[in-house]
């Protein structure tokens, strides 16, 4: 897959709630800097975390508005629409990706944390 294909698949699998397929897009030694979950190293750590997404969110959509690809790197501006514990979440976000051998080796996401506060506190 090309970098663009991997990034498209990242959002397709997330929006389908297919977190196993989503995790398959990452290298075993992946590093993620996630706005809410913090610094996450290794696919072995990430995969069980993502297994809980279906329980944490009754609805989760992360829709890309603009994607830029430069070789093995990409960035996306997205909009998140989610529902957790009866609370709707709407937030704009930015994602940065570095790929190695056709898989995501590093990613970071940045977004306003205020819309997620009721979920994080409850």
Name each model-derived stretch:
Residues 1-28:
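Short acidic-aromatic low-complexity motifs
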Residues 69-80:
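A short hydrophobic beta-strand element
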Residues 96-118:
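Short beta-strand edge/turn micro-motifs at domain boundaries
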Residues 82-90:
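Short, cysteine-centered beta-strand-loop-beta hairpins and adjacent loop/turn segments enriched
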Residues 31, 87, 103-105:
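Residue-level signal for well-ordered, solvent-exposed loop/turn and beta-edge residues enriched
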Residues 61-62, 89-94:
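Short, surface-exposed coil-to-beta transition loops
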Residues 19-71:
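A solvent-exposed, acidic/Ser-Thr-rich amphipathic alpha-helical stretch
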Residues 26, 80-82, 95, 111:
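Short beta-strand segments enriched in hydrophobic/aromatic residues
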């Amino acid at each position: 897959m090309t970098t663009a294909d991997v990034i498209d698949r990242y959002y397709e699998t997330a929006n389908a709630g297919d977190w196993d397929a989503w995790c398959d897009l990452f290298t075993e030694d992946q590093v993620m800097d996630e706005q809410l979950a913090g610094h996450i190293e290794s696919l072995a750590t990430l995969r069980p975390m993502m297994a809980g997404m279906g329980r944490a969110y009754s609805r989760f959509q992360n829709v890309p508005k603009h994607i830029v690809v430069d070789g093995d790197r990409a960035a996306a501006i997205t909009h998140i629409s989610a529902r957790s514990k009866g609370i709707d979440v709407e937030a704009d976000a930015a994602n940065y990706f570095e790929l190695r051998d056709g898989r995501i080796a590093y990613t970071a996401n940045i977004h306003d944390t205020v819309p997620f506060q009721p979920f994080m506190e409850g």
